[in-house]
């Protein structure tokens, strides 16, 4: 069978070679046909055997797979039951308080509880001690304030009483002057005759202007006493008399000026540390907090505050100095 190609030259060159090859291959093709017919018959028998074998093996595989699935399910159920029994046993140990997983954290918690309880007890004692100290400081400050107020009240009452005594003494001296008039008046009354006596006094003839006193002698005496008291109190020519009770003089120089305290030639300001000395008591140190017109507030080392009156410094009941 001729082969058509793109060029004619190519067809002529290969024509002879194809004839030679065809003659050689003709003998071999007959042999191949015989072998192929025998192999086809053998392949038909083997294919039937392969199908049966595959079906058989497929069934075996399915059976084996089902067995494996059943075994896996059984193992899974068994493992679940074992794990459940282990968890139940561990839970019973925890409930009974014997599991090490429970005992170790429990011991740690108990140790922490003991430490915190101990710390809380120490803190409680410190708080109680602090409250007790504050209470004692308040009591001490209240007592000192009461003593200061008592001394101030005593000084005030004493000065008022001394002033009253002085005025009474002045009144007594002024009354002594009028008492002589009172005695003279009484003596003159005694010397008078009885008004019911038959002897009558002759009328006095007065020439020129005259004043008729319509007041009684006792009223005139009372008016005279009142005038003498007013003159002794407000008159420009007041006669000063020494009172019987000597007033307490200022032994020390103390005053307050523009927020500063002057005492015995030294100046004190707020914030300075001073030493307070009182008779029959130990000296104490304090810090000046406030300086008013007539009092000085200071703070003691224990935190309590007290005040000191400038009049007490003047009278020498207290003395201060720079610390």
Curated annotation (Swiss-Prot):
Residues 52-84, 149-180 form a coiled coil. One of its GO terms (biological process) is positive regulation of stem cell population maintenance. Pfam families: Sds3. InterPro entries: Sds3 (IPR013907). The keyword Plastid does not apply. Involved in the histone deacetylase (HDAC1)-dependent transcriptional repression activity. When overexpressed in lung cancer cell line that lacks p53/TP53 expression, inhibits cell growth. This is Breast cancer metastasis-suppressor 1-like protein. It comes from Mus musculus (Mouse).
């Amino acid at each position: 069978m001729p082969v058509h190609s793109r060029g004619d030259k190519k067809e002529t060159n290969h024509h002879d070679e194809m004839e030679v090859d065809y003659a050689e291959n003709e003998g071999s093709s007959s042999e191949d046909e015989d072998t192929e017919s025998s192999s086809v018959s053998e392949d038909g028998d083997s294919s039937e055997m392969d199908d049966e074998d595959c079906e058989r093996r497929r069934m075996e595989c399915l059976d084996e797979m089902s067995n494996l699935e059943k075994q896996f399910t059984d193992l899974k159920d068994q493992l679940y039951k074992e794990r459940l029994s282990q968890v139940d046993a561990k839970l019973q140990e925890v409930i009974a308080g014997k599991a090490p997983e429970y005992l170790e954290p429990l011991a740690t918690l108990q140790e922490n509880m003991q430490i915190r309880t101990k710390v809380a007890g120490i803190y409680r004692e410190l708080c109680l001690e602090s409250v007790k100290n504050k209470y004692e400081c308040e009591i001490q400050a209240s007592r000192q304030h009461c003593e200061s107020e008592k001394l101030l009240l005593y000084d005030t009452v004493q000065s008022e009483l001394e002033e009253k005594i002085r005025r009474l003494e002045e009144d007594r001296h002024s009354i002594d002057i009028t008492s002589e008039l009172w005695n003279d008046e009484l003596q003159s009354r005694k010397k008078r005759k009885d008004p019911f006596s038959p002897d009558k006094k002759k009328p006095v003839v007065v020439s020129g202007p005259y004043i008729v006193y319509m007041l009684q002698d006792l009223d005139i005496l009372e008016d005279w006493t009142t005038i003498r008291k007013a003159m002794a109190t407000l008159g420009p020519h007041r006669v000063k008399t020494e009172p019987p009770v000597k007033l307490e003089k200022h032994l020390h120089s103390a005053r307050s000026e523009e927020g500063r305290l002057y005492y015995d030639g030294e100046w004190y300001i707020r914030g300075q540390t001073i030493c307070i000395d009182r008779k029959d008591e130990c000296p104490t140190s304090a810090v000046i907090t406030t300086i008013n017109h007539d009092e000085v507030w200071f703070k003691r080392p224990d935190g309590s505050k007290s005040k000191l009156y400038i009049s007490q410094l003047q009278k020498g009941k207290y003395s201060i100095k720079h610390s």
